[in-house]
Amino acid sequence: IFLTAELTLKSDFSLEELKDKFQNTFSNESFIRYQKNVNLVNTSGSNYCDISIHQNSNKKIIVQASLDNLMKGASGNAIECFNLMHNLPYNEGVGSLMPFYL
């Protein structure tokens, strides 16, 4: 899945402020990565969601995201839920799945 969304912000933010907010929000998430540019091939067959932010103006940004809906979606989610049900770290075993592009 490749998403491109244009968003209007309620307040003015610089691109650096937006990147900092993103990294503060998702710094503890194993499978969410900030990328300068998102490329679908980098998430194919993986449990990663890659996100990039580009700025049109102080209040308009473009967010792009890429994920594999089989791994990050159905099968990756099933493994994460199994782990949580059995009191294991949610990312146990998921990080060892090799992406298709390697």
Q: Which residues are covered by each model-predicted region?
A:
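C-terminal substrate-binding/catalytic lobe of Rossmann-fold NAD(P)-dependent oxidoreductases
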Residues: 1-64, 71
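NAD(P)-dependent Rossmann-like dehydrogenase/reductase catalytic/cofactor-binding core
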Residues: 48-50, 54-102
